[in-house]
Every structure is written in structure tokens, then in C-alpha cells.
Amino acid sequence: MATARARAALVFVALLQMAAVVVVRASHVVYPELQSLEAKHVDGKLRTGYHFQPPKHWINDPNGPMYYKGLYHLFYQYNPKGAVWGNIEWAHSVSTDLIDWTALEPGIYPSKTFDEKGCWSGSATVLPSGVPVIMYTGIDPDERQVQNVAYPVNLSDPYLREWYKPDYNPIINPDGGINASAFRDPTTAWYGPDGHWRLLVGSKVNMKGLAVLYRSRDFKKWVKAHHPLHSAHTGMWECPDFFPVAVAGGSRHYRRGVDTAELHDAAVAEEVKYVLKVSLDLTRYEYYTVGWYDHATDRYVPDAAFPDNDYGLRYDYGDFYASKSFYDPAKRRRIVWGWANESDTVPDDRRKGWAGIQAIPRKLWLSADGKQLVQWPVEELKALRAKHVNVTDKVIKKGNYFEVTGFKSVQSDVDMAFAIKDLSKAEEFDPAWRTDAEALCKKLGSDVDGGVGPFGLWALASGDLKERTAVFFRVFKANDSSHVVLMCNDPTRSSYESKIYRPTFAGFVDVDIAKNKQIALRTLIDHSVVESFGARGKTCILTRVYPRKAVGDDAHLFVFNNGESDVKVTNLDAWEMKTPKMNAEE
């Protein structure tokens, strides 16, 4: 990512090289000799304690999340036969609280001609009658990606254990100039004022990503619109998501989710904007825009303030992909799920017997100023908090650090706030850095002394600090005398293992730090995951790490400051986290 065309070309080459190292697995490169080798042993040393994952084998995209008859449902892409991608079906789990999960029988699996070579990602739509419907991408005998529908066998069953696929599938074929090998991941459908249902399917034409729009009166026959809902020159769009969010100026309850069914109310419709999120197959990042949607013309126009390209805002600046949101009617909120892939190697995954987790489900809403989305772990997560320690008003001078003791940090929730009294020592900010936070983080890592910062946490650290994952802030001074805050997750020293992929992840934080000279950081630590939320959820970064020494009781937590300006930890609350019921069979 860069501002100059020539530099952008170099970065593009680098991204391709990066993909060759690790991302190809996320792009579903097939290992025929490995995909059906069942794990005989599951190595639990680095398995997460409270993040969602099945007992063994490969998982990827979250699919069809919904709430039905008192239960949260999550389907997800799963290989029942091995720890690499292949044999994909929709595994199915249910929960009453988004924390404890029970595994059920697979919801959708290859069983018909129209999906005999795979059941890929999709979404759930709850019809006005209360009937839930799954729409998903099937791979047919000709390797075409087609869109199919499935209905519950028994609507009185809150577990929705069985699904049937009507014979009139596929309901959408890749006709009319659509690339049959790049046509997948249908969205949740929405009902328009003209009596038509609408949904999007991700696709591309050359390097242009497309959100292809389809309409239907009966949810059976779907007709392609003359134009996509939206497009941009970013490469293939996977896992599109399109949904309304409340605007603060129009509602006192702007943090609530908005159900598309409510949009028939004209007053509600005037108080919302729309979010279009896409997952970029080329870079394996996601980005989103916020804008206006015209129901009459079926046009979506992003607000000018939102970059409509791969420099755009992201849900998460780390290892977070193929996200899918849903409206939770029980608590009137929108929740987003995201897949966190492994960063180790295929042999490592086979040895472990598992690969992939889901990020902690997050509540999502539009910020009060309308400039970005904000995310925060669902409130139910607090039920797992156990032993607690607290630190207050502790000043850290340049080059100093302290250990947070009295609890086990390897599976923990750490919520803290920093105060910076003196911002005068902030380094000058080069405007060219604005489009490449990751490169800036890599250049100015946690061990590079600065003016204001770097300051933050060393998580999953060994006692001698030779292994550690840094989560930190660094403050710069811009030409207009405002301040720019950089947030980084730096795993370059996270493990003695040399063959794993350890990129720095970073994003800028939209906060006026000069106003109150404070910034908050919450970090969820879970054996091989460091999931951080800066400035109360304005910037989120998830990192996968694989320490060799900093495991179990040998994992430590430190707070550090390598900046000239003193930093005060005004408050730090840390909790050990209990292990919930995680996908044991009913």
C-alpha cells in the first residue's frame, strides 16, 4: 500500500510473495494428499480456551449466524476429515449466550448435484413469517459456483437440526456474463418497499470487485439487476455484507442494531445509513464504507470521507477475514463474527490436529460522529471473568516496564487506560505514512525509542522477555499541530519458531488525544491469540502467535514504555478467564 503508483506496484508484488508464503491456504489451495487425513491426536498446548473452535480439524468462514427461538446459531466452513482445507461442509453449533457452545450435526453438506463438490459460504435470512432460510454457494459438477437455498425440516425445533434443499436449486446461476469461478457468498436478503427481495453475491470482472444485485418476489426465482449495487477496482469481492446502522443524530439509541424489517417504517429509514463490507481475495484484508442507499434505484453511494479501496477502514487490521454480521433481536444489536486463520505452516496444523478459530463475537455500531464503525466484545464475555487484579496510577518512565502479577495471563481479559501528560515530545508525522500503517509499525516497532511511545503491553511473554507479543501505541505530531495515534500488534518476537508468518499489524486510531491525554486498550489473550481493542473499539487488531516458552503458567504479562514522555497507567483491570463449554457434542 502506498501513495505513489510505482511504490504501489512494488507493494503489489510483495503482497503476492506474502500470499505464496501463507495466504494461499486461506485462498483454498487444495492439498489432495492431506485433506482427508484425520487427526489422530490433538495438541492442546496452544488451543484457545474461550475463542470459538471445534474439537479438531480445519475451519474457516463463519456462515449464517442468526437467532432463532432462544438460541444463537453459528454455522461455519469445516473439514470433518482433516486439518487442511477440503471436504467443506457447514458445521453447526448453538448457544444461549454466545459463550457456551454445543456442536450439532452438520447443517449443510454436499448431497445434491448442485453442491456435490462443496458447500461454500452464505448467509441466513429470517422471513417475515419467522421461517429461517439459508442461502449458500454450491460447487456443481462443472466446478461452477451456483447459489442455493435450504429450509428447516422442522420449524418447531429450536436447534434447527435438519435442513432440506428444494429440487428447484440452484436459484441463481452464473449467467449474463458472470464469471462462474468467481461468484460466491450470498448475503442476507432484505425486503424492499416495492415488494421485492434483494441480495448480493460477490464477484469480479477483471480487477473490478462487484456486489452483484439480484431481486425476487417469491424467494425462488431471482433476476439479476442491470447494474451491481456497487463496485471498485480492488479485485474479487468475497463475503460481502450489507446492512443498516443507526445514525446518532437521528436516534438516542444509535448503538442499537437495526433490523432490515424495521426499514418499512419511514421514520426509522430516515435515521439510518448503510454499511457495505467486502473481503478482498487478493490481499486477504477486508474493508468497509458507510453511505446512502437509494431503494428506488438500488444504488449505494459511500460517503466521500470513506476511502472506497483497499486503503479503506477495516473491522480489524489483523488476522480477521470473511466476516459475517447478523441482527440479534433478543438484545437489539448487530453482532459480527470473523475468521482468524493460522499463521503457522501446514505441517504444524497437521501435527496440532486443528486449524482456525473464530474471533470473539463483537457488537458493532456507527460512532456518534459517523466517521467509522465501533466494535466491542459482546457483554456476555464478562461471565467468564474469574480471578482479578488491579493496578492504578503507576508511572512508567522511558525504558522501564513492570510485570502484572497475581493472576495467570495466558487466558485473560486485560482492560486498561494510559495517560500522557506531555505530548510535546511527539515525533513529526510524515503524511506519506497515512496509507501504510503496517510499514510504519514495522519500521518503528516496540523496541524503537520514540517521543510519545511506544507504550503498551508485552503479552504471552517469557520471563526473560525473549518471547513476547507487543501491543502498543505511538503518538505523532502532524503539520497542523494535531496528533496522529498509531496502534500496533507486533509479533516479530512472539516465538522461537522461525518458520511461522509474523507480520506486524497496525492501524491509526481516530482519537483526539490532546483533548484529555488518555487512551484505552483492551486485550483478550488466549494462548495463541492476542485480540486488542484500542480507544474503546475504534481500532481492532487480532494476531495469531505461537510461543514455545511463554505457554501455560510460563506466560507473563508486562506493561512497558519506550518513549521519552512518561506514561501513567491510570487503571488496569485484568481477569483470568474461565473456559466455557466449547463445542462438546450434545
Swiss-Prot record:
GO CC terms: apoplast
CDD domains linked to this entry: GH32_Fruct1-like (cd18624)
Gene3D superfamilies linked to this entry: Exo-inulinase, domain 1, Glycosyl hydrolase domain, family 43
PROSITE patterns: GLYCOSYL_HYDROL_F32
SS bonds (residue pairs): C441-C488
Expression sites by tissue: Weakly expressed in flowers.
Binding site for substrate: W58, I59, N60, D61, Q77, W85, W120, S121, R184, D185, E238, D281
GO BP annotations listed: carbohydrate metabolic process
N-terminal signal peptide: 1-26
Record InterPro entries: ConA-like_dom_sf, Fructan_Metab_Enzymes, Glyco_hydro_32, Glyco_hydro_32_AS, Glyco_hydro_32_C, Glyco_hydro_32_N, Glyco_hydro_beta-prop_sf
Single Gene Ontology MF annotation: beta-fructofuranosidase activity
Enzyme class: hydrolase
Name of the molecule in the record: Beta-fructofuranosidase, insoluble isoenzyme 3
Organism of derivation: Oryza sativa subsp. japonica
